[in-house]
């Protein structure tokens, strides 16, 4: 059953390279789903902490901001950077200011 859950989760994720604003730090989203995100950053984070971030999306209608809050569920050292997996618990989307 665990394999089916992992396969289902993988099917829902979208590989990407979107800028992430971490409120004083920057990162790059490498994959996104409706319930989570994985991003790389130079900043350090702790497993279990709450994190707020904004993903910048260039949509056909203009620049959109996906503002999220979530729980850090995994940390992966990646050379000089760190990979952070977040389970999104709250999100809103809005147009960016011109």
Model feature map: region roles:
Residues 78-89:
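Short, solvent-exposed secondary-structure boundary/capping segments
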Residues 1-32:
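N-terminal helix initiation/capping motif
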Residues 30, 93-98:
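A short macromolecule-binding patch
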Residues 34, 75-80:
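Short, conserved beta-turn/loop elements at beta-strand boundaries and strand-helix junctions
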Residues 29, 70-72:
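Conserved hydrophobic positions within beta-strands
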